[in-house]
A protein has these predicted regions:
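Short, conserved clusters of charged catalytic residues that mark active-site
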Residues: 40, 107, 149
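PLP-dependent aminotransferase-like
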Residues: 69-131
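Active-site region of PLP-dependent enzymes
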Residues: 128-234
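Short, well-ordered alpha-helix to beta-strand connector turns
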Residues: 51-52, 117, 135-137
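Conserved PLP-binding active-site segment in aminotransferase class I/II-type PLP enzymes
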Residues: 1-77, 99, 163, 194-234
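Conserved alpha-helical elements of sugar-nucleotide-dependent glycosyltransferases
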Residues: 37, 41, 88-91, 183
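Conserved SAM-binding loop
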Residues: 56, 84, 156
Length: 234
């Protein structure tokens, strides 16, 4: 029995459906409401990584943003600066700015994963290997060039249940999906950052094919020097 309230508009007709959910059933996975597939994927990734909880998001960048917002809005941290490598992807300092902090670029040699100091937040976008969970909030990516190339998507890994529950509502417009939409009082002013069931299904199918141990797909030599970019020096 699904814990979710049923889709308000019902199911799509077969000719409009993406194939991943049917492929998942053919591979032996069982689910009722399609949103259960997101749960399956979250639990599968969390177990693979060595974390207690996984919260699927529509991209790694939004996972970083929500992790930063947890520290700012829930933990009420007064830290102003977040220290990151100067050689990384440009969305990382942008999310820091969007979350209300200021990025500080440092010379850091890294591979696969690095910390957004002083917080226990880890950008693990370019690492995918069994047991990879570091600590705190560890965010992974399912972008097209990553080891699990869904095309778009990410996941926040954590051992903190309170944070996991908060993230789950914040990714879906503040909604509690176990309550009917008409009855939900929307506990939080959330974001539209959820992962679709079809993308989660693709992630499951890919995980069942990709090796458990993989080399990092990026490091400090993969990216340009963000400390020289005009947008971060204004």
């Amino acid at each position: 029995m699904t814990e979710y309230k049923s889709w308000p508009l019902g199911q799509l007709p077969p000719e409009f459906q993406r194939p991943e959910l049917d492929q998942l059933k053919k591979n032996g996975y069982k689910f009722g409401d399609p949103r259960e597939v997101v749960d399956i994927f979250e639990k599968k990734v969390a177990k693979f990584a060595g974390a207690k909880y996984g919260i699927a998001v529509d991209c790694c960048s939004h996972g970083l943003f929500l992790s930063l917002k947890w520290y700012k809005d829930v933990m009420k941290m007064i830290t102003e600066h977040i220290h990151i490598p100067r050689y990384t992807y440009c969305s990382v300092p942008m999310q820091i700015i969007h979350a209300g902090f200021k990025p500080v670029f440092e010379d850091v040699t890294w591979s696969g994963i690095y910390q957004l100091r002083p917080f226990d937040i880890w950008d693990g976008a370019v690492r995918w290997t069994q047991g990879m969970y570091k600590s705190g909030f560890h965010i992974v990516s399912f972008q097209l060039k990553k080891r699990i190339p869904i095309g778009r998507g990410g996941m926040i890994l954590t051992n903190d249940k309170k944070a996991a529950d908060w993230f789950r509502k914040m990714t879906y417009d503040g909604r509690d999906l176990t309550i009917s939409y008409m009855d939900d009082d929307f506990e939080y002013c959330g974001y539209h950052y959820y992962m679709t069931p079809e993308d989660a299904a693709r992630g499951i199918l890919l995980m069942d094919q990709v090796p458990n141990k993989n080399l990092d797909s990026g490091n400090n030599r993969t990216y340009s020097d963000l400390s020289t970019k005009r947008i971060f020096n204004e």
